[in-house]
UniProtKB/Swiss-Prot annotation:
Key words, A-Z: DNA-binding, Glyoxylate bypass, Repressor, Transcription, Transcription regulation
Binding site for glyoxylate: 160-161, 212, 222, 239-241
Keyword DNA-binding: yes
Domain HTH iclR-type: 24-86
Name of the featured protein: Acetate operon repressor
Gene name of this polypeptide: iclR
The protein's role, per its UniProt record: Regulation of the glyoxylate bypass operon, which encodes isocitrate lyase, malate synthase as well as isocitrate dehydrogenase kinase/phosphorylase.
Keyword field contains DNA-binding: yes
């Protein structure tokens, strides 16, 4: 049995896709289209993409065909829906290959899963959109376990990895991010008050790990700690996730210590420092 993962919610038409000063408008639009196709985990109709982008069908089609010529997207099925192309995978994979991140981390993830008995995730910080993205996972052997797709995005304010990243930002940066992103309520336990969230982040900094207490999905808990690069900047996070029935109040501190230790081990193996 797999614990439920929150369903995707609809997007507003992209009034927010207007480029910031200095950006190339067509490039920004094309990259957003590619991102939306990737998030669909399948294929998307032209009309749906145009609606999400707030663009005419003709403009959307022109952007897509340009990316198709470069191999970033492709058309599939009889209806000609749009899906991610192989070249997007090649480009994206270079992030991991550049420092062989997964080869370093995966054995540590597996050991952490064995020691904790729960599913362990590796997430990286998407600096451009300030979201946590799962790039590796080792699932536990329990019948009831947490499951999330590789490439899945985690909300910064309502996930273990996200709050671990947020805790490393200044109060001004957090305030700015919350102003842009808002505080969506995924469950009744989601921290939707900026004051309460900032208090939670202060506790995270003090103890060294974040704690998601059913804030993203009911019945699930998660602890997470950041991994740092050679510039002392957090770029990834390890997390342990599982059902409340096993991650009891008594186990949270124990698992928190485990994830801190593992994150420090990855930081050192990666050549980073804290």
């Amino acid at each position: 049995m797999v614990a439920p993962v929150p369903a995707k919610r609809g997007r507003k038409p992209a009034a927010t896709t207007a480029p910031v000063t200095g950006q190339v408008q067509s490039l920004t639009r094309g990259l957003k289209l590619l991102e939306w196709i990737a998030e669909s985990n399948g294929s998307v109709a032209l009309t749906e993409l145009a609606q999400q982008a707030g663009l005419p069908n003709s403009t959307t089609h022109r952007l897509l065909t340009t990316m198709q010529q470069q191999g970033f997207v492709r058309q599939v099925g009889e209806l000609g829906h749009w899906a991610v192309g192989a070249h997007a995978f090649i480009v994206g994979s270079s992030f991991l290959q550049s420092r062989n991140l997964l080869a370093i981390v995966h054995p540590i993830l597996r050991k952490l899963m064995e020691d904790s008995g729960e599913t362990v995730n590796l997430a990286v910080l998407d600096q451009s959109d300030h979201q946590a993205i799962i790039i590796d996972q080792v699932q536990c052997t329990q019948l009831m376990r947490m499951s999330a797709p590789i490439g899945g995005k985690l909300p910064m304010h309502a996930s273990g990895a996200g709050k671990a990243f947020l805790s490393q930002l200044s109060e001004e940066q957090v305030t700015s991010l919350l102003h842009r992103k808002g505080l969506h309520a995924y469950t009744h336990a989601t921290l939707v008050s900026p004051l309460h969230l900032k208090d939670d982040l202060a506790q995270t900094r003090k103890r060294g790990y974040s704690f998601d207490d059913e804030e993203h999905a009911l019945g699930l808990r998660c602890v997470a700690s950041c991994i740092y690069d050679e510039h002392r900047e957090p770029f990834a996070a390890l997390s342990i996730s599982g059902p409340c029935s096993r991650i009891t109040d008594d186990r949270v501190t124990e698992l928190g210590a485990m994830v801190i230790k593992a994150a420090k081990e990855v930081t050192l193996a990666y050549g980073g420092t804290r």
